[in-house]
């Protein structure tokens, strides 16, 4: 089935040093069953052959527009693309990932049917040894802002990534990705959640998120990883102030973010800054009782918290084993 909707969808693809993955990504966009696309490739100062490959791909399909710019990071490249987008709707695809052929047709059908500001699908993690859907739930939900916030906080069916979404262009152009932030999607999703009025989300995993060991979000720890704590704190403060009945839920989400950073510090072989590690442990010590009695937090997670506070060496051993299994080593 092919779709030739009258409305134009602009797809923003930031490109930086991904020459071995880029063609697979762009082929998956070119082959979308929704044909009325504007494919914007933003070469963010790539130092490999990615920029040249963008130009070659543009010769094969007149829907592709290529822009070359100085390196400014992922957020800057996305903002650059959004500013130049002429579509009625805007979507994002990362250049080392790829999408199923029906993704934008189905997102467009949903956003039009429900007259929503944002449509969002499920996605898959693509590991070297396995494939896993973000959620196995079956759902098709039409949500207002308050209902979507609850889903976002609970992380059951809403991940918070830009690349699972189709967004009204007028809305997408109001929001900027924060330049220089590592977990830019979190900051962006929070602003989107504040501004959008209506959402439709469904369970089909059309986006394929490739877990590369040397990707930005899966590399050795550096201080930029602490951006995750900043956005976790921002989400917590916003939700508690506006939706106090979700305090336990958002406290759980905040705890997960702190755990993620603590784990990244522990598994990184070349990171010895004890200040950040100790600061994060202070958070867990300070909030230990509230986390322990929080009925939104699983028993397994509470056991993990106890092991981490009592025996760091044992916790690290368990964590490293889990990390190796996850990455297929």
Where are these regions (language model features)?
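Membrane-interface aromatic/basic loop that binds lipid-linked glycans or pyrophosphate carriers
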Residues: 269-329
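Acidic helix N-cap motif at the loop->helix transition within catalytic regions
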Residues: 23, 37, 48-57, 98, ...
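N-proximal low-complexity "stem/linker" segments adjacent to membrane-targeting elements
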Residues: 1-30
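Catalytic core of nucleotide-sugar-dependent glycosyltransferases
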Residues: 206-212, 218-246, 260-289
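Donor-binding/catalytic cores of nucleotide-activated saccharide
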Residues: 74, 95-200, 210-223
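Glycine-rich, basic loop-to-helix element that forms the pyrophosphate-binding segment
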Residues: 69-85
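A conserved acidic beta->alpha catalytic loop
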Residues: 28, 35, 43-53, 70
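Short aromatic/hydrophobic "clamp" motif used to bind/position activated sugar donors
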Residues: 90
């Amino acid at each position: 089935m092919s779709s030739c909707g009258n409305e134009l969808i602009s797809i923003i693809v930031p490109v930086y040093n991904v020459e071995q993955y880029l063609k697979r990504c762009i082929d998956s966009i070119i082959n979308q069953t929704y044909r009325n696309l504007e494919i914007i490739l933003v070469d963010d100062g790539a130092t490999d052959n990615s920029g040249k490959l963008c130009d070659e791909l543009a010769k094969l399909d007149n829907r592709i527009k290529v822009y070359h710019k100085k390196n400014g990071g992922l957020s800057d490249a996305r903002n650059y693309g959004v500013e130049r987008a002429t579509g009625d709707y805007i979507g994002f695809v990362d250049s080392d990932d790829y999408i199923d052929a029906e993704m934008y047709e189905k997102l467009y059908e949903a956003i039009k049917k429900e007259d929503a500001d944002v449509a969002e699908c499920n996605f898959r993690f693509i590991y070297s040894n396995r494939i896993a859907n973000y959620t196995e739930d079956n759902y098709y939900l039409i949500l207002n802002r308050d209902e979507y916030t609850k889903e976002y906080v609970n992380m059951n069916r809403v991940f918070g990534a830009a690349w699972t979404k189709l967004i009204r262009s007028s809305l997408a152009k109001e929001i900027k990705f924060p330049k220089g932030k590592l977990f830019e999607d979190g900051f962006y999703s929070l602003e989107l959640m504040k501004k959008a009025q209506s959402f439709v989300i469904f369970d089909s995993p059309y986006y394929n998120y490739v877990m590369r060991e040397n990707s930005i979000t899966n590399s050795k720890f550096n201080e930029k990883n602490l951006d995750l704590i900043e956005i976790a704190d921002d989400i917590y403060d916003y939700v508690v102030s506006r939706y106090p009945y979700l305090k336990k839920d958002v406290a759980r989400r905040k705890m997960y973010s702190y755990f993620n950073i603590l784990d990244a510090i522990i598994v990184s072989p070349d990171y010895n800054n004890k200040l950040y590690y100790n600061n994060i442990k202070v958070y867990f010590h300070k909030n230990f009782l509230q986390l322990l009695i929080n009925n939104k937090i699983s028993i397994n997670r509470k056991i993990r918290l106890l092991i981490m506070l009592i025996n760091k060496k044992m916790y690290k051993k368990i964590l490293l084993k889990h990390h190796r299994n996850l990455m297929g080593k």
